């Protein structure tokens, strides 16, 4: 009998082992769909971004008008731009849900997969930040100025790093040019990291909602999960296209309809919604260096998740106290997101400080203590 090329060809064999004959736990829920949705988001962003880059000019005098030209004069340019801008929001929705699922079901115990995932999040955040600067609107310019200026808080070398990143003494043409270069490069880095992420995942096999070893009960990825993923893709593309067609500017900042002006500061500088929780943590500390460290810690704390796991059970499915804490953490993050969008005045300052403190207390102190308590309860 002739060998099946799907199982013998070097390249097809790799694809087959990752997407077709991959043994998958039979009980993984829709929460496991977000990995494939993130892959779709990445492909959509790279494709729309490539088309936008063909019409974009990375120059301070032309950037704003080149984006306007894309929307007005390029065939379906408005749609490509709207899909790209809102695609970023959906990318972050998916990654936050993906991380939340990993946290809830103890997927972080696959340490290599988890750590590459956190690196992916950091790279995605960097990509979104440099991309936000490119249209060269008011909030683009001032956002870039404020966030890059944070590095000046680093003792001794801070100011040098900032001027080196800017390519001058303020955010100007060299900054825009290098941000465009970085925004073009980083998505391909994300794609490379994704392959590493998948390699580590397929090394250990996927986790499941029960958190138990599922070697005795696995099914092939295709057709079961390939079909389930296609349903997920349809359910993601529906709200994305609806938003791009009906309310493309819903999540954007009105300030970005004004070209960048270094002489006029917007009344309230704030980043895109998906960075607001971290921005609120940054602002809640009156000291500049302290704020920058808290901002970094708000994301880097994810690296500690495997070390802080003290429970005898992997998932939170049967741990009501940990579930309560988890949802308190989700509510806390929503409060931080809201606070980040508000001006720096009473009562928002104190709410932000309380929410920031609670965020770190829940993650670093309450979760391990609760896990230890639940372990004790198991013995009764």
From Swiss-Prot:
UniProt topology in membrane: Multi-pass membrane protein
Top-level taxonomic group: Eukaryota
CDD domains attached to this UniProt entry: cytochrome_b_C, Cytochrome_b_N
Subcellular location: Mitochondrion inner membrane
Positions contributing to heme b b562 binding: 84, 183
Alphabetical list of SUPFAM superfamilies matching this protein: a domain/subunit of cytochrome bc1 complex (Ubiquinol-cytochrome c reductase), Transmembrane di-heme cytochromes
GO function term, MF aspect, one: metal ion binding
Record field: transmembrane: 34-54, 78-99, 114-134, 179-199, 227-247, 289-309, 321-341, 348-368
Binding residues for a ubiquinone: 202
Pfam families assigned: Cytochrom_B_C, Cytochrome_B
GO-annotated cellular components: mitochondrial inner membrane; respiratory chain complex III
GO terms, biological process: mitochondrial electron transport, ubiquinol to cytochrome c
Cofactor binding, per record: Binds 2 heme b groups non-covalently.
Chief site of localization: mitochondrion
Cofactor(s) required for function per UniProt: heme b
Protein keywords: Electron transport, Heme, Iron, Membrane, Metal-binding, Mitochondrion, Mitochondrion inner membrane, Respiratory chain, Transmembrane, Transmembrane helix, Transport, Ubiquinone
Binding site for heme b b566: 98, 197
Subunit structure of this chain's protein: The cytochrome bc1 complex contains 11 subunits: 3 respiratory subunits (MT-CYB, CYC1 and UQCRFS1), 2 core proteins (UQCRC1 and UQCRC2) and 6 low-molecular weight proteins (UQCRH/QCR6, UQCRB/QCR7, UQCRQ/QCR8, UQCR10/QCR9, UQCR11/QCR10 and a cleavage product of UQCRFS1). This cytochrome bc1 complex then forms a dimer.
Miscellaneous comment in the UniProt entry for this protein: Heme 1 (or BL or b562) is low-potential and absorbs at about 562 nm, and heme 2 (or BH or b566) is high-potential and absorbs at about 566 nm.
Function: Component of the ubiquinol-cytochrome c reductase complex (complex III or cytochrome b-c1 complex) that is part of the mitochondrial respiratory chain. The b-c1 complex mediates electron transfer from ubiquinol to cytochrome c. Contributes to the generation of a proton gradient across the mitochondrial membrane that is then used for ATP synthesis.
Entry's family note: Belongs to the cytochrome b family.
Descriptive protein name: Cytochrome b
Gene transcribed to yield this protein: MT-CYB
